[in-house]
Structure formats: C-alpha cells, structure tokens
Amino acid sequence: LGLGYQSVVKVPVDKNKKMDRQALKQLVEKDIQDGNIPFLAVATIGTTDFGSIDNVKEMSELCKKYNMWLHADAAYGSGVILSEEYKHRLEGINLCDSITVDFHKMFLLPISCSAVLVKDGSTFDALTIHADYLNRQEDEEDGYTNLVDKSLQTTRRFDALKVWISFQARGKDGWSKIITTSMSNAQYFYQQLSNDKNFEVITKPEISSVVFRYISEKTENTDEINKKVRRQLLHNHGVVIGQTVSNGHVCLNFTLLNPLMTHEKLDSLRELICQLSKQAEEN
C-alpha cells in the first residue's frame, strides 16, 4: 500500500500458528487510543510455513465494529473451498472484502497466475483513470473494452486462460479430488510422524504443509542434523523439502501438492529421513 513499515502492525500468533485474535483486538484498540486510524486487517488462509488458517469469522466481527477492511491472503489456501471434505475450514471467507488467490499454488498452474477477488466490483473504480491517450471517457460510454481499469499496471497477460482451461478440463469435482487428496496425504504424514518417537511435529496441518524435525537422543545439535539430512535428501536422493525455524529450532517443511503421492511413498520418505538422521547422529 506504500505506507511504510511503520504503518504495519504485526500481530502475534498462538500455539497453532494462527493470528492471536485477542492480541489483534488489543492492538486495534491501542492504535485508536494513540490517535491512529486502523483501516485494514489481513487474515492468512494458509501461512507459507505451516499452512495455518486464521479465524476469518471472528476477525470479520472485529472489522465491522471498527469499520476496517478485511482482506484474506488466500494465495496458498484458497483451493480448500473446492474440497467437499475440508471446505468447512474456510468458514467465513465470504465475509472478507477482498481475497487474494494464487492459481500457481494449490491449483498447480504455471507461474504467474493470480487474482484479486472483491465483494463489491465498484471497488475497482479506484483504479480508473481517463486521459486523451488512455481509456477515454467516451470510449467507456460507447462500450469499448479496456483493461486499464483491471490492474495497477494498466494491462495484464492472458493468465486467465490457464484458469479457464484447467476448470474446463477438470471441473469442480476434479479439483475437489486433487485438493482433497493432497490434504488427506498431509494428515496421514502428520499422523505417522506423530506416532514416531524420533520426530516432533510442530503443529497439526490444516492444509497440506507438515513442519517437523528429527529429535536426537545422543546430541543437542539437532539443528545441524536436520540441516544435513535436508542436504542429503536433495543431493543423494533427489528429494526436495523445505526448511524453516520454529521456536528457535531448525525444522523440515514438507508441502504436499502432488495428487499422485501415495501413503507408501510417504512411509518410505519418513523411513529415509529417520535413517539419514541416525547416520548423521553417529557422525
């Protein structure tokens, strides 16, 4: 928004890596007391690391009370709405004033392919500009189609074609199956890791990201072990997984989006990580 870092207030998260709603309320009220004007709250529908989903319904009530705009960053998690099994996790997303969607994430399309959805289409009028050389007023009145009003850069690529073709090919049921499969695989992987005393899982996945770490009984240097295992997975086994930090500890981050992934492959991966971790532990 071009307001500078000083205008952005970071809100703490709870133990499940979701926005702390009580902290949000307190920060908004403090801003008002300090003479500031809080006008926008951003909920995350699928955080980058943990895939956590903020409670949009409660945030909406707060935003209505203080006349704030509610935006949902659903770049990662927007596809959950198409899963018949898991769509309830996005309860209240319809209450948002605007939503960000990245079709190049859960929808598996080539980058870049993103969209901003707004509840009130007239919101885009803020982008409207008229000039003799650009989007003349009389042209608009005569019904000419012009993409000037559709983006800040006054034009855009035909990325919508990717979305249209994929939905024509797969349909709602096809996407529901793909997204549900990825989320169910994440639940399975989480459960298997939770039952394995060699691993600590940071939080229960809400979408398809599982964040975990190997726990060593022989050394306190588990951070280096997890880093080493990640490198070995890449260079020796062709397995690419992410890395992040939680509570000061290095963790591995596995985001499942491939609908062809099976439980057997996930079991093999868990066993491989455990084997490599124990080898690193000895060295």
Across the structure, where does each feature detected by a protein language model lie?
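Short beta-strand
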Residues: E200-P205, I241-S246
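Active-site C-terminal subdomain of aminotransferase-like
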Residues: Y66, E91-K197
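Short, glycine-/Ser/Thr-/acidic-enriched flexible segments
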Residues: K15-N16, G46-T48, G77, H104-M106, ...
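Alpha-helical scaffolding segments of alpha/beta enzyme cores, especially the outer helices
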Residues: Q26, D54-E61, K65, Y188, ...
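A generic structural signal for well-ordered alpha-helical segments
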Residues: C63, L193-S194, L233-L234
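Conserved PLP-binding catalytic core of the aspartate aminotransferase-like
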Residues: V201-L233
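Conserved PLP-enzyme active-site core in the AAT-like
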Residues: L1-S122
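PLP-dependent enzyme catalytic core of the Aspartate aminotransferase-like
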Residues: S246-N283
